[in-house]
Amino acid sequence: LYGERAGFLAIVIHEKESMQKVISQVRSLIRTTYSNPPIHPARIVKTLLKSPSLKQEWLEELAIIRARIKEMRHALFVGLSANGNERRFAFLNEQSAIFSFIGLDARQVEILRQENGIYMPANGRINVAGLNTHNINYVVEALLACNIRK
């Protein structure tokens, strides 16, 4: 589903008068972002949720993925905090998403790309799900070296 760009948006509105304004803004964002949502992810989700066995299998797989991402976040935190930076990188243990902004600027991201073959958007958003036990030390060392040049 990740590659299919499935998503969900929920907005709680306490004042009825604000509802049309919010709907208008959301429609504007939708129009500039993707215009028409893909139908394939919705069909996948429908199939998964209608079948108890598929739903259970999916939930088990999600639990495994969440645990692995949490483990990699913690490993990233431990590695980056080795030199007394615990407070600076504490957010890594507090977050749970696939991506995290790690505080690099565009110049530092370019250094990582050129010197270490580590790719991420210029805003410093790292894909934690792309980390594993084989590359975490390499990534941590490169990030620390890049941060030292700040």
Show the residue positions of the predicted features.
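Short, well-ordered loop/turn and helix-capping segments at boundaries between secondary-structure elements
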Residues: V12-I13, K50-L54, A82, A145, ...
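Active-site PLP attachment segment
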Residues: L1-K21
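Active-site-proximal structural scaffolding
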Residues: Y2-E4, M19, P38, I69, ...
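A structural signal for short secondary-structure junctions
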Residues: Y2, I39, F91-E94, M120
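Structural signature of PLP-dependent enzymes
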Residues: I23-A42, L48-F77
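Conserved PLP-binding catalytic core of the aspartate aminotransferase-like
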Residues: E57-E115
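PLP-dependent enzyme catalytic core of the Aspartate aminotransferase-like
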Residues: L104-K150
